[in-house]
């Protein structure tokens, strides 16, 4: 057994004075223990301690659920989760019926609104006084009792009393506001009868224009009606001059009573028409100042003030002022007769049916609506009378009764104080709303006994949405946060069986099936998810974002962009491309090299247009080449990606113009500033005063000094230039060509040095002086003498070729020279030999210098010789037929070696 909780106990040994449960009375103590004066024995002391421990365990078991339900009661009163009148077993609490739904028509909506507007659009608010009533206390037999009775009454019955009615306007002031907080709008005095013996013949009226109670826009304005009654002591009440203000000596005999009524408030609107009773309370001379919040003090409250919460029959102990409130278009006279009052009262009954403002009751008014008042309206009071049954609660623990309440006829719930009006509704409420206990109904004669035990099978876990508990404290069940997203329910199974008739037999025994077969009717993921990285709960508004895909939150993207901007060793274009690429990889979470091809494709789909627009075309191509160099993507991927980017560029006209403009700017930069800037001759820079020698002198001097300087020239290779420039320079130097033809039999050293010097000097000549080398390729392939006959090219003029080109040239030379079976060299030996030499010189020899002294006749002779050799070769090939070796075919050779 668990140890008993230490409590402060009284001298009563059975613990009957311990704290009770829910404020109910304890059972009677044991009479034998209470009446025994002899000290108990050891066995009796042990039994007594065991009983106290069981009592402590009983109190501990019932204490926690009771505190929980007490807290839920307070919360449900201020912020209810549901309305009890909507429950099927609480039909008696539903004061409204749905009979009007049968005869409801859409066309009637306009009529009802019109009637409502007509009823509200009145011009005057009338206060019709009835009388002033005060309950007479029980009379005493002696004379002192008569005197005490006269002192307690305001005045003698049937006397007239003056009532001062004042209308005040209270405005919530702000800083630097010129309007008054407290303003008096209207004040009138009327005569009413105090405790009339017979029926009142005339009634005093006050008409208040509604124009004086206009709301001031959004400013909080309150209109309050104050009733004050001044009466004198009985010694001066019958005086003829009672209405005049008393002198200073009689002022202590003056009494003042007052009450207030709120006519208009911004939150509730105008007060409802009806019959009212205002409870009057004693006031002193400074009570009127209590209306101002700045002047409100505790001293203004009278000593005889009785709060409403302390006295139940406070309306019976204070004077009551009866009056009517009506609305009409006409102003009433100051006094009306009783028959006219009945006519206005009937008007109130007719207007009450069209009144829809049912919630204008204000607890600040010390008034109680009796007929068509604030508690009335079109609501219908339930006609069912509450049951009168003697009910007792029996609290049991360990199958033993530990505490029992007194018999009561109230059908209120002991934990939440709800008036259930019927025994069946009470038992149903206890079973469904207080599931921490088990309730068993036992008939007991004309009453009922309800056994209360602890529900050990109660699941204390939260059965609602787990997201309510994950939110901030205080906002889980808040109703002021507005509409928020909630978790979606996969499927909702609704079972609405046929309702059976209510019977108390269902509470006789516990339902074992309901305890064992408890299951949720809501299916789906009724659980709480958490973020992977932060382990924080995922709120319903974050369910669309996958927790695993949170690799690029906003703060991380901003931090990445900031870090890239801080780089100093890359240009702006590379920075922009790095931002786009890094954010793209972070967003999609590419983790492997095999995903890079699809990453490049997705990158172009998402950022292709932006790449062209930001002029990042070359940066992206360089990035693709870098990926290829590191082996991350294949060449096919590079080709497809660039081709796709070209396709995007072809459809983007603005991008094409931008690329063209940027290309022109880049070329201009290269030619003006970059590596392709035109540089001057270094020799000219060394000796700017010495003029450059002519081309023929330079070539002559270089040819004469080539023999002596061959060793130095071999150590310093000449400046290499394209072949077409070398051939063009050779054609544009006539002096050098003539000297080369006359000295054709010189050594190889002199000829090679001569050609090098000519190539060097010809590079500086303008392109306009260069001849077309295609026409001279075959003509100047061999050197010619003065007579115009062709000479074999010198070995020094041959160009070094690769092995592949040499193989092709050898095959062609073999076919052109007349290999075995061709028959070309038999009949035309000289022609074939010269043709072979010509083919060799035309294909793999450098162009020799042409003789500038040859005339036009020599040119025509060379053309005739070419045609003659061509015709002879054609005849020879045609005469040799039949043999396989005699068939001559033309092999495909590279274009640069092909004969022009």
Swiss-Prot record:
One Gene Ontology cellular component annotation held by this UniProt entry: histone methyltransferase complex
UniProt name for this protein: Polycomb protein Su(z)12
Residues the record lists as Phosphoserine modifications: 547
Region described as VEFS-box: spans on this chain: 527-603
Gly residues bias spans: 820-834
Region (Disordered): 1-44, 678-900
Complex and partners: Component of the polycomb repressive complex 2 (PRC2, also known as the Esc/E(Z) complex), composed of Caf1-55, esc, E(z), Su(z)12, and possibly pho. PRC2 associates with the accessory components Jarid2 and jing to form the PRC2 Jarid2-jing variant (PRC2.2). PRC2 may also associate with Pcl and HDAC1/Rpd3 during early embryogenesis. This complex is distinct from the PRC1 complex, which contains many other PcG proteins like Pc, Ph, Psc, Su(z)2. The two complexes however cooperate and interact together during the first 3 hours of development to establish PcG silencing.
Compositionally biased intervals (Basic and acidic residues): 1-12, 773-782
Species, as recorded: Drosophila melanogaster
This protein's record includes keyword Repressor: yes
Pfam families assigned to the protein according to its UniProt record, in alphabetical order: VEFS-Box (PF09733), Zn_SUZ12 (PF23320)
Keyword field: Chromatin regulator, Chromosome, Developmental protein, Metal-binding, Nucleus, Phosphoprotein, Repressor, Transcription, Transcription regulation, Zinc, Zinc-finger
UniProt superkingdom: Eukaryota
Protein family: Belongs to the VEFS (VRN2-EMF2-FIS2-SU(Z)12) family.
